[in-house]
Amino acid sequence: MLIENTVNKLNEMRLTTMAKAFKDQLTDTNIANMSFEDRFGLLVDQEWTARKNNHLKRLIKNARFSESGACIEDIEYHADRNLDKAQIARLSTCNYITERHNILLLGATGSGKTYIACALGMAATRNFLQVRYIRLPELLTELSIARGNGTYRRVIQQYKKPALLIIDEWLLYPLKETEARDLLEIAEARYKKASTIFCSQFDIPGWREKIGDPIIADAICDRIVHNSYSIIIDCKESMRKRKGIKEI
C-alpha cells in the first residue's frame, strides 16, 4: 500500500517519469543492491531527462520551422556555394545570440538560405533558446491585422520575446509606407536585445530600394547591418535542382 501511495503521489505531482522509473526499480534485481542515494539519483536523472526532452520538443514545435528536419550536420558544402564551414560551426554554438548579434543570409532563390537559417535555429533550440521562424509576407499581414483589431503593441511584444527570430523572404517585394514603419518597429524592439536572422535575395542597397522611404531605410538598416554576421551563398546551381528528381 505504501508503494502504491508513493506512486500515486508522484503522478499527482506530475512526476510521471519518476513514478514509472520507481516501479521499474522494484522489479530490477541489479538496482536492488544499490544504495538509496544511487537509486534516488537514477530516479531524478530520468525525470530530469524526460522534462528536458519535452521542453526541447515544445521549443521546436513553437519555432514553426519551415524546414523541420534541418540541422547543422546536414548542410551541404558544395564548392560553388562558397560557404565558410568554420564560420557556420562558430555560429552554431549560439554565442552570437548571447552577444545579441544578427545574421544576414544572402543568396539567390534556391541557394538554400532557408535550410541554413532553420539549421541555425535548430541549434539554438538545442541550447534551449526560444526561436521563431516566419516569412516576411506573413509577418506584415499579421501586423496589419493587429493594427486593425487593436492588438498591434501586443504582437510587437510577441516578436520581441524570442531569443532568435528568423525572418525569411526578407524584402522580396517593395514595401508600403505602413509596412516599412512596421519593420522599423520590429527592428527597434529587437535592437541589442535579441538576435535575428534575415534571409534575403538582395544586398543592402537592394533593401533600401525595397523599403522606399530613405529615412526609414536608414533607420532600419542602421539597427540591423552594423550588428550582423554575413553569410553570402554564391550558388551556381539551385539546391532545389540538386535535390530534384534525376533523369533516368
Please place each PLM-identified region on the residue numbering.
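Charged, compositionally biased N-terminal leader segments and the immediate start
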Residues: 1-20
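Conserved hydrophobic/aromatic pocket- or pore-lining residues that grip, position, or stack substrates
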Residues: 75, 117, 135
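Phosphate-binding P-loop
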Residues: 92-100
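N-terminal pre-Walker A segment at the start of P-loop NTPase domains
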Residues: 70-92
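Walker A/P-loop
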Residues: 105-129
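Interdomain "pre-motor" coupling segment immediately N-terminal to P-loop NTPase/helicase cores
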Residues: 16-68
